[in-house]
A protein has these predicted regions:
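N-terminal glycine-rich, Lys/His-bearing helix-loop that initiates the first secondary-structure elements
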Residues: 1-52, 432, 464-465, 470-476
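Conserved PLP-enzyme active-site core in the AAT-like
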Residues: 8-16, 64, 71, 84-305
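Short glycine-rich or small-residue beta-strand-to-loop segments that form or flank ligand, phosphate
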Residues: 59, 80-82, 160-163, 321, ...
Length: 476
């Protein structure tokens, strides 16, 4: 890496030059540097709204970059800058390699953006059902033996998609999967929404590009310090960059936010220059928090002790995932208590676990406050866990492709009456955004009970036409 070159931030520098010129705007956006919306300017600040500008020659154009945006992408190792979140990056990957009828091998515990891409392009999923840790109620990684079996049984598949890592920090044998897939001429796509730091920290699981994957969708905003909704799509050698750009432009906005673009540019510079040091501190804070939480009693903050060489090939130690059923509370209940009673906002709570996202903006005093609150919750709210559900993953039975089911003729039924039917829509807790049900899957009584239980516990649910999640669209 050329550290001298990495000190540059071309988009940020161009915006600074633009700001100093005091250009009179007769273009969009219509707030005209905030003058037309003083309440917005007061909320965000005049400098912020003053830099919310449209594409122009001095600032380049994301859809066809030739100057400062192109320079920024080159400094990010030929990455595509994305302003539609990692959702758009994941969909860009899949649409770049899959066409209607193509098979793609992937774990079922993927983010909804991956299955949405299958709805758009008509590709057919070949699911490698992940192993499940029944004690923790979480799905694990892709066992390489199952991946090998799927590749052997589906030699016509065009790609394999891998989570690296999962939301909970679980990593599969990415290098091994890449080797197997490439031997059969398949592309390897990595959803690294939760893996930005893998490119900068020491002692962390291998990142997708180093493992030889063909493409990786990376959420710079999650752990890299850029603004929400900003992301990157990385390409390895052998991918046609011009074709991928065309695919991205099918769905990406033509009005890219320069606030998002400049945040990617600045964050890339910061991580290139100081990322190793910054994430070294993150690892220390996460390990400290894990040890402190485990000393409380009742909780289990898991880490590398889960590694088994197969379904948990490695573990991302920056992830502070905590099992809560030991104190008789669902993860979502602890999540709500932390926010409502202690003014602590963590990433998510599910049926069995919580996740506190630790990154470059955290301080040790924040960690102490979280640990203290969890100790308080254990002391004040602990109860018997009898009767609580422990499963987080339900293996699906796929009857038809997501696209076919999504566009099929459907009817709305009360959830309690849908067992045995084929789902025509998604149901998921968000976060993490992993579908409990996806279009084309059979609804079982177990799934119905799980959805009702998750609702009862207060999980934030989405995906259905019915905003109350009381009815489901099923195929006629």
């Amino acid at each position: 890496m050329d550290l001298e070159a990495q000190k540059r931030a071309p988009i940020y520098e161009a915006l600074e030059r633009f700001r100093k010129k005091r250009v009179v705007p007769f273009d969009v956006p219509g707030h005209k540097r905030g003058r037309g919306n003083p309440e917005l300017a007061a909320l965000l600040g005049e400098k912020c709204v003053g830099l919310d500008v449209n594409s122009m020659k001095p600032l380049d154009n994301l859809c066809h970059p030739v100057s400062v945006i192109r320079e920024a992408e080159e400094l990010a190792a030929e990455a595509f800058l994305m302003v539609g979140g990692t959702t758009s990056a994941v969909q860009g990957m899949i649409l770049s390699v899959c066409k209607a009828g193509d098979k793609i091998i992937l774990p079922r515990n993927v983010h909804k953006s991956a299955i949405n891409a299958l709805v758009l392009c008509g590709a057919v999923p070949v699911y490698v059902n992940p192993e499940v840790n029944g004690d923790l109620g979480i799905s694990l990684g892709m066992d390489i033996r199952k991946v090998e079996k799927a590749i052997e049984e589906n030699p016509d598949a065009v790609a394999v998609l891998v989570n690296n890592p999962t939301y909970y920090g679980i990593c599969s044998d990415l290098r091994g999967i890449v080797k197997l897939a490439h031997e059969k001429g398949m592309k390897v796509l990595a959803d690294e929404a939760h893996g930005t730091h893998l490119y900068f920290g020491k002692g962390l699981p291998v990142n997708a590009m180093a493992a030889g994957a063909d493409m990786a969708a990376v959420s710079m905003h999650k752990s890299g310090g850029s603004l929400t909704q900003s992301s990157m799509l990385l390409l390895n050698k052998g991918m046609n960059q011009d074709y991928v750009r065309q695919i991205i432009n099918l769905t990406q906005t033509t009005s890219a936010s320069y606030l998002l673009l400049s945040s990617l540019d600045i964050s890339r510079r910061n991580l290139a220059l100081r990322g190793e040091e910054s994430f070294g501190k993150v690892i220390q804070m996460a390990e400290y928090a894990r040890n402190e939480i485990n000393s409380i009693g009742g909780y289990y903050a898991y880490g590398k002790d889960l590694v088994n060489g197969t379904s948990v090939y490695d573990f991302d130690v920056t992830k502070l995932s905590v099992y809560t059923l030991g104190i008789g509370l669902a993860g979502i209940e602890v999540y709500d208590l932390l926010r409502d009673e202690y003014d602590i906002q963590i990433e998510f709570g599910d049926i069995c676990n919580i996740l506190a996202y630790i990154s470059i903006g955290d301080r040790i005093q924040d960690i102490e406050r979280l640990v203290g609150a969890l100790a308080d919750i254990e002391r004040l709210y602990r109860k018997d866990k009898t009767g609580m559900l422990t499963g987080e993953y339900i293996s699906p039975k796929v009857e038809c492709s997501p696209q076919k089911a999504f566009y099929a003729q459907k009817v709305s039924l009360p959830i309690e009456q849908t067992a045995g039917k084929i789902s025509g829509e998604f149901v998921m807790c968000y976060p993490p955004g992993i579908p409990i049900l996806a279009p084309g899957e059979v609804i079982t009584q177990e799934i119905v009970e799980y959805i009702l239980y998750a609702k009862e516990k207060g999980c934030s649910m989405q995906g259905t036409e019915d905003p109350k999640i009381e009815r489901l669209m099923v195929l006629v």
